[in-house]
């Protein structure tokens, strides 16, 4: 997961790593949509701090590549049921058709993200939800306005989708 530019700051790219390391009450962390190379980097960085067995007991990953090829379906049964869930949506897993972010961009469609979210939302034990991954500030104004409009449209669609389950 990408490190923040400012040391000791928690970013949407590294909070998962920190909670995996430090939260003894964590039952399962599920990452959906990162590139396989980013997931492998997380395992490499944890070598020495946690062994792979400890990591694999708490971490369940569905890489972009697994989702694209359909291999993800083989792992869905490993998701622990009946636990409280906190959902953190990082829009940088989405394709540029849906959002313009300030980090590396994924290729997931919004309907695919919604299908994944429904696995958790239908359980009904949601503690909270956050959404991060906005456009970069400091880019030329026309591009910034265009990116903001695209992001706002996606934010609105996500809000409407989530509202069916939590409001």
Residue ranges and their predicted role:
Residues 1-37:
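Active-site histidine-anchored catalytic micro-motif
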Residues 3-6, 41, 139-140:
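A generic structural signal for short coil/turn motifs at secondary-structure boundaries
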Residues 24, 28, 46-48, 53, ...:
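Short, flexible coil/linker elements and helix-boundary hinge sites characteristic
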Residues 37, 53-54, 58-167:
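Catalytic cores of soluble, metal-dependent hydrolases
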């Amino acid at each position: 997961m990408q490190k923040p530019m400012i040391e000791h700051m928690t970013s949407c790219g590294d909070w998962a790593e920190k909670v995996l390391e430090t939260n003894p009450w964590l039952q399962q962390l599920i990452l959906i949509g990162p590139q396989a190379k980013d997931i492998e980097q997380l395992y490499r960085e944890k070598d020495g701090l946690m062994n792979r067995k400890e990591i694999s007991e708490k971490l369940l990953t569905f890489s972009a590549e697994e989702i694209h090829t359909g291999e993800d379906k083989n792992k869905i049964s490993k998701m622990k049921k009946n636990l409280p869930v906190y959902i953190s949506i990082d829009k940088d897993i989405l394709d540029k058709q849906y959002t313009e972010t300030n980090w590396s961009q994924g290729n997931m469609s919004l309907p695919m993200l919604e299908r994944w979210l429904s696995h958790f939302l239908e359980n009904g034990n949601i503690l909270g939800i956050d959404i991060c991954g906005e456009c970069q500030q400091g880019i030329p104004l026309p591009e910034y306005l265009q990116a903001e409009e695209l992001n706002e449209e996606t934010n609105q669609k996500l809000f409407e989708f989530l509202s069916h389950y939590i409001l």
